[in-house]
UniProtKB/Swiss-Prot annotation:
Main location (coarse class): cytoplasm
Gene Ontology CC terms: cytoplasm; ribonuclease H2 complex
Catalytic activity: Endonucleolytic cleavage to 5'-phosphomonoester
Name under which the protein is recorded: Ribonuclease HII
Keywords: Cytoplasm, Endonuclease, Hydrolase, Manganese, Metal-binding, Nuclease
EC number from the UniProt entry: 3.1.26.4
Domain RNase H type-2 per the UniProt entry, residue ranges: 10-198
Gene Ontology process terms (BP): DNA replication, removal of RNA primer; mismatch repair
């Protein structure tokens, strides 16, 4: 893994996404500028934290960060653009939503969207860079809450459990009930359920 060198600048934003793999719902991104004067203990990749810990950290991040913002790309945008381009768009939206413009942006992964300030992609950034860890927590808590809300409207699909990912249960219910308007029609299993696969 390439050694990561933290940029020498004051206002660094971390950006991460949640929801590239699911068959349903938006891809959600977050951008966070942490306050060096108000450190947050225990930041880590959101997937490595318990739900209870994520929720507590989410509130602490919102309270202590210099600025934070959420971005998203809806299922119809994912279908029109493809998941990679939709994710880049959602990241741009998260950065644009910050009320303080960052001097530098660190993005989780290996690709950067076009941004009006310098940016760098950091592989495994969600466990290496506190700003990206914070962004991953905000994005995951937000998207999980959306899946729980969707589960109330469509209880037969089990969205609260699998968060829209293509589990055996989700695929079984997709075949049984068809797709909701929140499903991503460009994704193979949804296409097949709708009879659109060629």
């Amino acid at each position: 893994m390439i050694e990561f060198v933290y940029p020498h600048t004051q206002l660094v934003a971390g950006v991460d996404e949640v929801g590239r793999g699911p068959l349903v719902g938006a891809v959600v991104t977050a951008a966070v500028i942490l306050d060096p004067a108000r450190p947050i203990a225990g930041l880590n990749d959101s997937k490595k934290l318990s739900e209870k810990r994520r929720l507590a950290l989410c509130e602490e991040i919102k309270e202590k960060a210099l600025s934070w913002s959420l971005g998203r790309a809806e299922p119809h945008e994912i279908d029109e653009l493809n998941i990679l381009h939709a994710t880049m768009l959602a990241m741009q939206r998260a950065v644009a939503g910050l009320h303080i413009a960052p001097e530098y942006v660190l993005i989780d992964g290996n690709r950067c969207p076009k941004l009006p300030m310098p940016a760098m992609a950091v592989v495994k950034g969600d466990s290496r860079v506190p700003e990206i860890s914070a962004a991953s927590i905000l994005a995951k808590v937000t998207r999980d809450a959306e899946m729980a809300a969707l589960d109330i409207v469509f209880p037969q699909y089990g969205f609260a459990q699998h968060k829209g990912y293509p589990t055996a249960f989700h695929l079984e219910k997709l075949a049984e009930y068809g797709a909701t308007e929140h499903h991503r029609r460009s994704f193979g299993p949804v296409k097949r359920a709708l009879g659109l696969a060629s």
